[in-house]
């Protein structure tokens, strides 16, 4: 019987080694370097009274973004799509979107679905020459969204991600070199030449011929701001007849196949004014009658990305491989223990 004790001790040693690694990789899938992540822009500014120039109607109706049933349904769809993270459009402290963002974090945390991470996209909420208090912004985000939800907040390069949307008052003044905070990975998103990540819209200077910037490729199903007052009237594939979205996804999949990118960003889940939404809706101009057409296209492309792209691996980056190896080793060890115990 004394022979068994060293084996049992060795088994527990192996368990103590593998379990924290498996636990870490499951809770923090972004730690796996051999996966292309898929994120989406999520707009939480709707209050139930939508602008009359919005012509596409969500199948959930003209909703209020803060309603728990709406948030829950959106995240059920996000889970179905197998998204990795959501960039929440945030318009400053005590703004309506601030309150909704807190509700989103609370609900997702209560549901315990840590497979989809959340991050903040700071929008240009102060359209004056007074400037922005970046120190206050960083501290507020850290204290209200990062610290309370360490498993839920999306991390890039080992730090919580905060994005800023380019704007005359928010980022142009610094020519893109905005004040940073060492607690965060900071990225500027938008259409200016200095941005880190491109946000596809009417004045993206190289949107249609975009190559991945910082290994991030951003795509949109279409663009149409013709109904928004004082806009350019810029249009790309308003009825989906040109197959623009499919072409963009094929480019993205090709980049992924060639290991040329780390993130695919989708613009957007629900920017209905600019008509870039992939949320199921009754579309005013689509040649497809199915309200889920663009949603299902996205779902299929993400599935192809995650299941079909074979990326280089050293054999130890996938959590599943860790689990299989650990189980095999433990099975052998416990078989030995069982055989010795019978003697």
Can you say where each PLM-predicted feature lies in the sequence?
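Secretory targeting signatures
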Residues: 1-33, 40, 312-343
